[in-house]
Design a protein with these regions (language model features):
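ATP-dependent carboxylate-amine ligase
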Residues: 1-34, 43-49, 61, 65, ...
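Phosphate-binding loop of NTP-binding sites
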Residues: 19-22, 43, 56-60, 69, ...
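Generic beta-sheet signal
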Residues: 30, 52, 91, 135, ...
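Short, polar loop motifs at secondary-structure junctions
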Residues: 32-35, 53-55, 71-73, 221-225, ...
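Generic structural signal for helix capping and beta-alpha/helix-loop junctions
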Residues: 37, 59, 98, 142-143, ...
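Beta-strand->loop->alpha-helix junctions that form or flank phosphate-binding loops
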Residues: 50-53, 91-96, 135-138, 233-256, ...
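Acidic-glycine-rich active-site phosphate/pyrophosphate-binding loop
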Residues: 253-274
Length: 458
């Protein structure tokens, strides 16, 4: 079967393309902007990429068009597809019907940490010999690829709450029918499609309703937004984690930066049943919590705690999640996907705990739909307190005046609207013992590579 994917370079759709290819289909696809790392991964796997949406790419007609959720009415390919009655479906529906139907699905949902937690869980299952399939919205460096079919009944999927397609406004994760579900956290996001937090909680409760009675739902005990979802009704076994005395699953920090910690599983009387210690290269309390959730999920399919902790101690990480892309002469540049104030805050706090008094420069492109609308502008100022200085990139798509940010931020701050000026300002600050954290959920107009080259030439 020839499958053509519209919006193929998105993290989800690109991963879907790999699964379709590995399942024996001929796969091609197109997108408005084709950029690494996804474009590189697709090309390496023999998947034809077309830049732009000229309808000629649909001649001769493929057997099926898989439509990404970034596609809308008015797109030339979408209009041609509809006018010519080409068979089509959404990415999540194709995944659920063709890949996940006969699997034990371990799904990772929540506002933050989905990609990292999914990668941790896949790493644990792989190290334990379970050879899982997976689809992850990023590229786990431990696996080297964002998706594979696997050789067992287990499948790890990053479960996104964004809508499925222009013709299916349900959240993607409704299509996955999870057996083991992690809900890491829950906050307001995606203001372009959700009116308020309650609208998101409604979708999450729909997700909870799809988990079988014999299934498992894993969540932090202290997240009130999740607790409100569960209060609407839950028919599955719940596993709560945190640091409360009555939490059966707990973490205990050995190092403040989260580079060493313990995981303890106790019975209802507080007697330890299993425990393990993680010593790894990651940092930040958010990653400790991600790890704990992954360990609990793995436990549900037979992996003991010490095995999981041993696997996580070798966890490398995920591309674009505090990925070191340049390191020389005291300058370290990180590429990070953070695009929400909570994620920005936890990432910078983790780095601060790790590097001590070294200079941290945060460079932030408010690129997500929610950020461009200015929904989070009240909390952005406090999210960067752990940095020493912040540079904001205000491109033409941002709908609000970012000047007010500078007044509210306690650290030195600049708002820059030209990429060349941003490179110049960053190079000026690139002295010894500086950590430059680039935060964007897009290609950032090639800024990462241009900056690295500029610093190399000093």
């Amino acid at each position: 079967m020839h499958i053509h994917i519209l919006g193929i370079c998105g993290t989800f759709m690109g991963s879907l393309a790999l699964l379709a290819k590995h399942a024996g289909h001929q796969v091609s696809g197109s997108d408005a902007n084709v950029y690494p790392p996804m474009s590189t991964q697709l090309e390496e796997n023999g998947i034809q990429l077309i830049e732009g949406f000229d309808p000629e790419q649909l001649k001769p007609a493929p057997d099926l068009v898989v439509v990404g959720n970034a596609m809308s009415r008015g797109n030339p390919c979408v209009e041609y597809m509809l006018d010519n009655s080409l068979p089509y479906t959404s990415g999540p529906q194709w995944l659920g019907e063709n890949i996940l139907r006969d699997k034990h699905v371990l799904a990772v949902a929540g506002t933050h940490g989905k990609t990292t937690t999914s990668s941790m869980l896949a790493k644990i299952l792989e190290t334990s010999g379970l050879s899982p399939g997976f689809l992850i919205g990023g590229i786990p460096q431990d696996m080297g690829i964002s998706a594979r079919l696997g050789d067992s009944k287990y499948f790890v999927v990053e479960a996104d709450e964004y809508d499925s397609a222009f013709f299916d406004k349900r959240s993607k994760f409704i299509h996955y029918f999870s057996n083991t579900l992690i809900i890491n956290n829950l906050e307001f996001d995606h203001a372009d499609i959700f009116e308020d937090l309650g609208a998101i909680q409604k979708q999450f409760h729909h997700l909870v309703r799809t988990v079988p009675g014999a299934g498992n739902i894993i969540m932090p005990s202290s997240d009130e937004n999740i607790n409100q979802v569960m209060a609407q009704g839950c028919w599955s076994c719940q596993h709560q984690f945190g640091i409360k005395p009555d939490d059966n699953w707990q973490y205990r920090l050995i190092e403040e930066d989260g580079s060493r910690f313990e995981i303890i599983f106790s019975d209802d009387q507080g007697v330890t049943k299993e425990s393990g210690r993680v010593v790894w290269s990651q940092s930040g309390l958010h990653n400790v919590k991600n790890a704990l959730a992954a360990v609990i999920a793995a436990y549900q399919v037979g992996v003991n705690v010490s095995q999981s902790c041993e696997a996580l101690s070798d966890f490398i990480g995920v591309k674009r999640r505090m990925e070191v892309i340049y390191e020389s002469q005291g300058v370290t540049i990180y590429d990070d996907f953070a695009h929400h104030p909570t994620a920005i805050k936890s990432t910078l706090e983790g780095l601060r705990a790790k590097v001590g008094d070294d200079f941290i420069l945060a460079i932030i492109e408010p690129r997500s739909a929610t950020m461009k609308m200015g929904v989070h502008q009240q909390t952005l100022a406090s999210s960067v307190k752990s940095a020493d200085q912040v540079l904001w990139y205000q491109n033409a798509a941002i709908d609000w005046d970012m000047a007010s940010l500078s007044d509210a931020i306690e650290i030195p701050s600049m708002i820059i609207n030209k990429l060349d000026d941003l490179i110049e300002a960053t190079v000026h600050l690139a002295h010894s013992n500086v950590h430059i954290v680039i935060m964007s959920n897009g290609g950032f107009e090639g800024f990462h590579k241009k900056l690295s080259n500029a610093i190399k030439s000093l």
